[in-house]
């Protein structure tokens, strides 16, 4: 550890070298905790990560195009939040199967082996997406209202597989169009705040898999504060408890979608989620306090 004020590097990507706009106050908030924090691009060869008392993964949004390189980088960091093994688990959405096996309610998810076996059944909508992805990059929504829906869904799945991606399918849950998505954020294992996020996949959308730095990733989102109910909190906490590895984690975002039978988990975001700090007064200071504790105590070894 350094002598004097702890030093923290906030890992980001080259597209946003000074971090996501939502976190522009984080460096100053860390300073209020007596911590020197600065942004650094995760794949910049000139960065000396060993100089930091703690490296915090934040807006590394381009990692999906170089996941193995990103995980090698993470495993090479001695003190990393969140830890490398957690990043590996969370960066591939096949974890939804593991959550379901542990009794966590999740969006029904199928791994596609043969793209030509896909069908969009009458009266349904199907989401086809890569298991590794950021935002809605690579995701397509196909409605049986179109006579060529099955053909289009198969073509999209085949394109994803041609890019080396594992393909997942999920039913499109119509209630998200009116109720939105509820994103629940935990800081240092404790519930911090939640937001409502509007639907991000309009009907008929087919996003390219190679657009991780394009419009799909940086598209403006409809965000507003939301108070989760007890059922939503319980589901989110059950998902958090099912995450393998050390707990508590510095930051967690659990994304829930509404159904007639209650909320279900769509994603467990442990790599580089937007935490919507601007939507929750005090949340940036809570995050900075948690970062300072870890930087000083030597927790979160990669």
Q: Can you describe what each PLM-predicted range is?
A:
Residues 35, 104-105, 123, 243-250:
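Short secondary-structure junctions
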Residues 52-56, 129, 182-186, 262-273:
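A short beta-strand motif that forms the metal-chelation/ATP-contact edge
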Residues 147-244, 264:
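Phosphate-binding site of ATP-dependent enzymes
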Residues 2-12, 74-77, 85-179, 233-234, ...:
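Active-site nucleotide/adenylate-binding loops and adjacent lid/helix of ATP-dependent enzymes
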Residues 3-7, 14-108, 113:
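Conserved N-proximal alpha/beta basic substrate-recognition cap immediately N-terminal to
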Residues 48-53, 120-123, 178, 258-264:
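A short, glycine/Asx- and small/polar-enriched loop/turn
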Residues 61, 136, 200-203, 269-279:
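Glycine-rich phosphate/pyrophosphate-binding beta-alpha loops
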Residues 190, 228-302:
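ATP-dependent carboxylate activation and anion-phosphoryl transfer catalytic cores
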């Amino acid at each position: 550890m350094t002598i004097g004020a702890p030093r923290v590097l906030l890992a980001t990507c080259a597209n946003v070298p000074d971090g996501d706009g939502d976190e522009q106050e984080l460096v100053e908030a860390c300073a209020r905790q007596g911590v020197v924090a600065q942004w650094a691009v995760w794949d910049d060869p000139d960065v000396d990560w060993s100089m930091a008392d703690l490296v915090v993964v934040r807006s590394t949004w381009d990692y999906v195009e170089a996941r193995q390189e990103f995980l090698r980088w993470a495993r090479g960091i001695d003190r990393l939040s969140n830890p490398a093994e957690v990043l590996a688990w969370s960066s591939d959405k096949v974890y939804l199967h593991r959550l379901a096996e542990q009794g966590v309610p999740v969006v029904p998810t199928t791994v596609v082996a043969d793209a030509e076996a896909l069908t969009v059944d009458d009266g349904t909508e199907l989401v086809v997406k890569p298991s590794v992805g950021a935002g809605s990059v690579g995701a397509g929504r196909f409605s049986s209202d179109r006579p060529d829906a099955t053909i289009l869904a198969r073509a999209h799945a085949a394109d994803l597989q041609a890019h080396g991606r594992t393909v997942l399918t999920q039913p499109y849950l119509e209630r998200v169009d009116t109720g939105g998505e509820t994103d629940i954020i935990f800081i240092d294992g404790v519930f911090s705040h939640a937001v409502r996020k509007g639907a991000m996949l309009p009907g008929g959308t087919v996003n390219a898999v190679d657009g991780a730095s394009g419009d799909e990733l940086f598209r403006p989102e409809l965000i507003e504060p939301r108070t989760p109910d007890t059922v939503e909190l319980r589901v989110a906490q059950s998902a958090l408890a099912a995450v393998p590895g050390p707990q508590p984690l510095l930051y967690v975002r659990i994304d829930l979608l509404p159904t007639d039978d209650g909320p279900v988990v769509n994603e467990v975001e442990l790599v580089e989620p937007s935490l919507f700090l601007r939507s929750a007064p005090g949340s940036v200071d809570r995050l900075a306090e948690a970062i300072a504790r870890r930087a000083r105590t030597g927790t979160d070894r990669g």
